[in-house]
């Protein structure tokens, strides 16, 4: 199943956390799920050139906290904070009367972000760069930044071929079945004259060891030895 499922969803609760965090009534869940989707779609489109690697949305009864991880946070903030104030005003119209808390954080190693790597490959394909060259360039930059392994896959009418096909490159290790492996996953689409080309990227950053359990939890139950009767055995009883 590791080869088929989304590696982020497969590792939720192990070494990955949810991107939408809230506890609400069951009846209002569809509304909030749709609201989070619309907010992410709006932010990704508006802040595309800022290099958005992740968006985390936290909701309470009266507040919404949005944390944006970007490779170029200066584009979002703007000169003197003018751009971020305009962004807050647009987001406030979308969320209504709830209090908005907007945090902008810098992606310290954008080369190790699978989402940014996938968008980079898609952008180069749209600019008519050879897809193999774009894939190899992303792989080299990720390995130089400390990645243990990376896999890049493209699918579609590559180079304008009549029949769609899938090609991929793999460097290093990408253990998708190992749940303790810290694997980042990203997906992007390249819009070309021949159709849409899908790009998927898996980046293996190392293994995350779980916290050591208490000695009481890990100790195996010991077998109790049978109790021996006190006193000497009557050897002559069997003979008689």
Swiss-Prot record:
Residues 39-108 form the KH type-2 domain. InterPro entries: KH_dom (IPR004087), KH_dom-like_a/b (IPR015946), KH_dom_type_2 (IPR004044), KH_sf_prok-type (IPR009019), Ribosomal_S3_C_sf (IPR036419), Ribosomal_uS3_bac-typ (IPR005704), Ribosomal_uS3_C (IPR001351), Ribosomal_uS3_CS (IPR018280). Residues 225-240 have a biased composition (Basic residues). Gene3D superfamilies: 3.30.300.20, Ribosomal protein S3, C-terminal domain. One of its GO terms (cellular component) is cytosolic small ribosomal subunit. PROSITE patterns: KH_TYPE_2, RIBOSOMAL_S3. GO terms for molecular function: mRNA binding; rRNA binding; structural constituent of ribosome. Keywords: Ribonucleoprotein, Ribosomal protein, RNA-binding, rRNA-binding. Residues 213-240 are annotated as: Disordered. GO terms for biological process: translation. Belongs to the universal ribosomal protein uS3 family. Part of the 30S ribosomal subunit. Forms a tight complex with proteins S10 and S14. Binds the lower part of the 30S subunit head. Binds mRNA in the 70S ribosome, positioning it for translation. This is Small ribosomal subunit protein uS3.
């Amino acid at each position: 199943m590791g080869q088929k499922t989304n590696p982020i969803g497969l590792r939720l609760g192990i070494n990955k956390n949810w991107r939408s965090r809230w506890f609400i009534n069951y009846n209002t869940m569809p509304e909030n799920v749709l609201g989070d989707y619309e907010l992410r779609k709006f932010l990704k489109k508006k802040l595309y050139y800022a290099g958005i690697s992740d968006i985390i949305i936290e909701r309470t009864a009266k507040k919404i906290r949005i944390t944006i991880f970007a490779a170029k946070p200066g584009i979002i903030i703007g000169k003197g904070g003018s751009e971020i104030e305009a962004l807050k005003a647009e987001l406030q119209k979308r969320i209504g009367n709830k209090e908005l808390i907007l945090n902008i954080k810098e992606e310290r190693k954008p080369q190790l972000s699978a989402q940014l790597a996938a968008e980079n490959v898609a952008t180069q394909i749209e600019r008519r760069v050879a897809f193999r060259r774009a894939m190899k360039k992303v792989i080299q930059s990720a390995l130089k930044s400390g990645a243990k392994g990376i896999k890049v896959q493209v699918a579609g009418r590559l180079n304008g071929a009549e029949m769609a096909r899938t090609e991929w490159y793999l460097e290093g290790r990408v253990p998708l079945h190992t749940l303790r492996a810290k694997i980042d996953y990203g997906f992007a689409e390249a819009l070309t004259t021949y159709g849409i080309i899908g790009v998927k990227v898996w980046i293996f950053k190392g293994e995350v060891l779980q916290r050591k359990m208490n000695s009481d939890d890990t100790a195996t139950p010991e077998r109790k030895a049978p109790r021996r009767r006190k006193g000497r055995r009557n050897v002559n009883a069997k003979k008689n």
